Amino acid sequence: MEIITPREQIRKFFFEKHLEFLTSVPQQRLQEIILSSCMKGHSGKMSDYGECGPAHRTTYGHFLAKGKWDDKRLEETQKRESFQTVSELSRRDGTPLFISIDDTVLPKTVPSSKAKRPTQGAGWHYSHLEGKVVYGHQVHAAIVGTGDTSLCYSLKRCCPENGTKIDMTLEILRSLPNQTGAYILMDSWYTNPSVLDACQEKGCHLIGAMKTNRILFPEGKRTSASDLAASLDPGCFHPVTVKGRTYMVYRYEGPLNKIDHAVVLLSYPAAAMGRKCALRVFLCSDSTLSDETILEYYSHRWTIEVLFRAHKRYMGLKSFMVRAAKALDRLLLVVALAHFFFSCGLGHIVPFHIGLHLCRTAFVNS
């Protein structure tokens, strides 16, 4: 049986995914960076690329910070090809198409007041993971998935040039093909009327967590979700089991503040029924879905948290060392492209971490 090396695989991948518009040198550098990132101990430093690739570390640093290559077109192509790959799987298998949107913080060391070349674009951001404000870069991400397959659709730095996180979310939605019927999954920070309107304009459905103080209008009476939950008799809730866990759920369907009509689920873990701190609220724009299906679909949002952990662990996003903001923006694009390659570029579709380890093993054995 013919054995195809990782270098041959990635050249084939670039051709099949229509990345041949890049000239030979940018293609070569991108391929070297992607393949270097699969090696054990990779930390996202230019010295890692220099040790694994044929060029010096400064060559890769210059390529990311100042190299002349069409990163905008590469981003558009990577988005289109990733979406098309998952969309075709969804149609073939008859499984729903999900797009999860979230953000994370990449912590960095606070620079000294005397630092002459501090890292560009870093600032203070609230980290949900650490539960406090930390110094670093905030990254906005979107993944597209169906079944057991998920690909990185977008990975961009939060900065004034890109607008607010809501602006970046709206830009993601505008970039999607029309009438895909996808379910857009997000946490309570992103669930708002403008995002819902953008989803509906694209023929998509929104399933998002909501803050418990959001205003509902049961029987025309203005009240918050938390107050409504507290006023209901326990008998109004019914059990819903999702992935082995049981929740007590009340379904509200009607208007919200600035939203004409949607489904809202008030949910408690069965063991914490009635506890105010345990209340979770979810909004769904697709009224045809059952309560169980809404919660099951929303559980797919966890995939983006797994992606953040994998990129920090394997792709060096936790320890990268580039100073220029442009270099980081391009590095994030390369990480998204690498995710695509390790998931789909080795002859068959596999989870990202499995593809990365397969590529690593092939290098060791070659």
Predicted regions and their residues:
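Contiguous, well-ordered alpha-helical segments that form the cores/surfaces of helical PPI scaffolds
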Residues: 32-37, 140-143, 335
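Gly/serine-rich nucleotide phosphate-binding loop at the start of the catalytic core
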Residues: 1-73
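A common structural microfeature
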Residues: 43-46, 57, 95-100, 139, ...
